Structures are given as structure tokens and as C-alpha cells.
From Swiss-Prot:
Organism: Staphylococcus saprophyticus subsp. saprophyticus (strain ATCC 15305 / DSM 20229 / NCIMB 8711 / NCTC 7292 / S-41)
Name under which the protein is recorded: UPF0398 protein SSP1297
InterPro entries: YspA
Family to which this protein belongs: Belongs to the UPF0398 family.
Pfam families the UniProt entry points to: YpsA
Lineage: superkingdom: Bacteria
Coiled coil region boundaries: none
Gene3D superfamilies, alphabetized: 3.40.50.450
Length: 188
């Protein structure tokens, strides 16, 4: 049974999304909600993120909204190190702080500020060790930062019975097309 999922993927700028009110964000959040509801029906209790802008913070917003219907669902934010948002602009820092304030658990793997790239790798390993599955929104046709995690994930799965759901742009496009079609049908 899946009790804990780690959700990660592209940062917003890697998808060329620079505003939270972009239509793509709405579709991505609906897709994430769809995936999480499937897991909730199977017994999901915790959603973990590292607190990165993009897929992770959008996931956090979805989880916080789902808590109205699923009050036992919990959000955990496990950052690589202290101060990971210090270089973000004020608006993004405020968004993160609002989400963190409403999360059920917030901590850092390293209880220090940034020391080096090893912190990201060890945090990824921590997330794999403390979750039952990963929902990774990543398509090899558009390489970006998640490619390093994906390789670690594949290696980890070969050594364990860990599972994952790697979502490609084709799956996202199909979901969006179905969603748009159903919305059009409801207006007729």
C-alpha cells in the first residue's frame, strides 16, 4: 500500500511558465489533483516535496486544497538546506512561506545553509528512502534539472521494489485534451 508519495518535476522556468495565473498552471494542478486522488483512494497519507518552485509548489497548493475533502492528507516539505528560498524574489518567498505555514511537517535534511551540490543528491536519496513511490513529471524530450533525479530513481528501483509514475508530455497532453473535451461537452 502506498502511504507516502514524493512529487517532483520541472521548475516553473523550465516549462517557460513565469506567472501562477498562466493557463498551463491550472491544467498541471488539475492533473496533479487527478493523480493524487487516485493515490488517496488507495490509502495515501503523505505527500512530500522539497519546496521547489514549479511542480512541487503547485503540488503543495493542490494538497492544501484537497485537505478540505481529505482532512487526513498531510503535506511534508523537506528542503535540502536552510535558506533555500533566500535568493527568490519576495513574491515567491511569500508564496513558499504561506505554503510552509500550512504544511504538516517542514524540515531540512541539512541543518545548515548551502554547502554544495552534494546536498541536493543526498536530499533526493532521503526522499526515495522515506517514500513509497514517486510521481515525477518529466519528459526526456525536454531535458532539464529532473534528469539527474530520474537517473537516481531508475537506479534505486533496480535495487529495490520501489515504484514510480513518470509522467511525460504525451500523458499530460492527453489529460488536457480529455479535460477540454469534457468541459466543452458540459456547455452543450
Amino acid at each position: 500500500m502506498i502511504k507516502t508519495v514524493y512529487v517532483t518535476g520541472y521548475k516553473s522556468f523550465e516549462l517557460n511558465i513565469f506567472k501562477d495565473d498562466a493557463p498551463e498552471v491550472s491544467y498541471l494542478k488539475k492533473f496533479i489533483e487527478h493523480k493524487l486522488k487516485q493515490l488517496i483512494e488507495e490509502g495515501l497519507e503523505w505527500v512530500l516535496i522539497q519546496g521547489q518552485m514549479g511542480i512541487e509548489l503547485w503540488t503543495a497548493e493542490v494538497v492544501l486544497a484537497l485537505k478540505a475533502t481529505y482532512p487526513d492528507l498531510k503535506l511534508g516539505i523537506i528542503t535540502p538546506f536552510y535558506g533555500h528560498i533566500d535568493r527568490w524574489n519576495e513574491q515567491n518567498q511569500a508564496k513558499y512561506n504561506h505554503i510552509a505555514h500550512h504544511a504538516d511537517f517542514v524540515d531540512s535534511v541539512f541543518h545548515s545553509s548551502y554547502e554544495g551540490p552534494h546536498q541536493f543528491k543526498q536530499t533526493d536519496q532521503f526522499m526515495l528512502a522515506h517514500s513509497d513511490t514517486t510521481l515525477l513529471i518529466y519528459d526526456e524530450e525536454q531535458e532539464a534539472s529532473p534528469k539527474f533525479f530520474k537517473q537516481m530513481l531508475v537506479d534505486f528501483m533496480e535495487k529495490t521494489n520501489y515504484t514510480c509514475d513518470i509522467v511525460t508530455f504525451d500523458e499530460l497532453t492527453e489529460f488536457i485534451n480529455d479535460l477540454q473535451w469534457s468541459q466543452e461537452q458540459s456547455f452543450e
